């Protein structure tokens, strides 16, 4: 043990003998992966299953949502998985992280994905396909999929496979529709933003769903109706000099969580990619 943890054999400046070293070891990993062009995602940060007994072994990984605030430069985190998630609630921890990005306190936003603690079919009632991450890509190539993951052009969905809901459109545009941004992008506007939402489901579904529109951590509007659902909503919100973000979530026919769209009332630009991943 001494030899393996001694220089020059150690690959990390941290060891298990100096107490809790906080976020530093994880930040080192995040920084190293980013420097090499990789992506990093925090997984299951609120799960309760990390504290349990496995025969003679006691596992203790307590819920740790605070890492989303304490760490910097990670690509994103799991907004949906097989446990209760609260950090995505309006005004919650995710919105605080995104607001920090809007205010210039963070260089990168944090994107959401779906993950599954999946081991085998029907264990705990789960099936492969219950947790899905949807991608907005022009071509289904490895390069385009990874770029969408890096830049937040994705959404997360939890359902009961093969039933599903699909986010066909979530966009913010100018009133005349000439400029438009989708998840992971930023749009500069000189007037009220127009939000468009289209959600469809599997062929047999006419389920009624409930969609929440969230602006910079504040619940703005709730839309309800059967699938397929189409919404056009002009938000009477124009704040020169401010930077805001919009995101949505959906309940009832499963759960769907979008990634944010940023609106900049400060810059004379049209649409650009937010600084992601």
Which stretches of residues belong to each language-model region?
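Domain-core and long-helix interface of multi-subunit machines
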Residues: 13-126, 203-220, 244, 248-250
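Active-site segment of extracytoplasmic enzymes that catalyze sulfate/phosphate-ester chemistry
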Residues: 1-12
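C-terminal functional module detector
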Residues: 101-111, 116-277
């Amino acid at each position: 043990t001494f030899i393996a943890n001694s220089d020059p054999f150690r690959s990390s400046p941290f060891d298990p003998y100096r107490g809790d070293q906080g976020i530093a070891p994880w930040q080192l990993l995040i920084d190293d992966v980013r420097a090499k062009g990789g992506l990093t995602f925090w997984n299951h940060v609120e799960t309760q299953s990390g504290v349990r007994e496995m025969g003679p072994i006691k596992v203790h990984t307590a819920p740790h949502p605070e890492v989303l605030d304490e760490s910097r430069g990670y690509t994103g985190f799991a907004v949906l998985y097989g446990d209760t998630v609260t950090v995505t609630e309006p005004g919650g921890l995710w919105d605080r992280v995104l607001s920090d990005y809007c205010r210039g306190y963070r260089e990168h936003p944090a994107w959401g994905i779906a993950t599954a603690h999946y081991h085998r079919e029907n264990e705990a009632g789960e099936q492969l396909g219950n947790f899905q991450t949807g991608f907005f890509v022009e071509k289904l190539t490895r390069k385009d999929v990874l770029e969408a993951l890096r830049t937040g052009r994705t959404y997360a969905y939890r359902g009961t496979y093969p039933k599903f809901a699909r986010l066909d459109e979530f966009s913010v545009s100018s009133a005349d529709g000439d400029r438009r941004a989708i998840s992971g992008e930023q749009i500069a506007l000189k007037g009220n933003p127009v939000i468009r939402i289209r959600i469809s489901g599997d062929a047999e579904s006419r389920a009624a769903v409930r969609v929440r529109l969230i602006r910079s951590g504040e619940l703005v509007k709730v839309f309800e109706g059967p699938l397929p659902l189409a919404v056009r909503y002009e938000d009477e919100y124009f704040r020169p000099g401010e930077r805001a973000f919009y995101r949505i979530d959906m309940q009832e026919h499963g759960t769907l969580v979008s990634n944010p769209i940023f609106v900049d009332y400060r810059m004379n630009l049209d649409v650009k990619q937010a600084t992601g991943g």
